[in-house]
């Protein structure tokens, strides 16, 4: 029902289960994550890569994902190993939740937080890149093709390269499809 509430094209639960690649990717991730936590990393990676082959969505088995993640259109989404995603998050196609550049000592980096933390009720537009161990506050909106490299405040709307806040209103209010007509540039 959370997908039907966020996607006007969703006609029935059956069509969502059978035809939405994001639903399949999240299901496979939950299975892969189970094996990852249990220490069966190879099995987890095989499940993850099989899911990627069938859905076009790559979610590392180590990523932590909350309830009701909706990946709409999905193709090209990449979610890195130390990513954390809150509840009721919507992600559109070609989004990357990626790590910052590798350090000289990649062994050291294996045990560090390298990917973003996404709060509850966030919407991430198509093509957006959220890079490094940044935090995106709850109810934030990341515009299409924005590049986020710094923390994002709660309820902010971020646009541009690098992303900048254009709106800080309605704190804590969930707006499934984005912004009002009154978008202010706060530069």
Regions found by a protein language model. Give the residues of each.
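Left-handed beta-helix
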Residues: 55, 60-61, 66-67, 72-81, ...
């Amino acid at each position: 029902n959370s997908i039907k509430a966020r996607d006007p094209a969703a006609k029935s639960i059956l069509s969502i289960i059978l035809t939405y690649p994001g639903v399949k990717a999240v299901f496979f991730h939950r299975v892969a994550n189970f094996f990852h936590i249990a220490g069966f990393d190879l099995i987890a990676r095989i499940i993850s890569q099989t899911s990627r082959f069938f859905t076009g969505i790559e979610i590392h088995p180590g990523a932590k994902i909350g309830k009701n993640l909706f990946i709409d259109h999905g193709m090209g989404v990449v979610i890195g190993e130390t990513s954390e995603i809150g509840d009721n998050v919507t992600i559109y196609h070609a989004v990357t939740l990626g790590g910052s550049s590798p350090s000289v000592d990649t062994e050291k980096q294996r045990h560090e937080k390298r990917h973003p933390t996404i709060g509850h009720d966030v919407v991430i537009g198509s093509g957006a890149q959220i890079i490094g161990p940044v935090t995106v506050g709850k109810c934030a909106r990341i515009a299409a093709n924005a590049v986020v490299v710094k923390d994002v405040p709660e309820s902010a709307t971020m646009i541009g390269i690098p992303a900048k806040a254009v709106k800080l209103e309605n704190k804590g209010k969930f707006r499934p499809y984005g912004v009002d007509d009154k978008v202010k540039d706060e530069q």
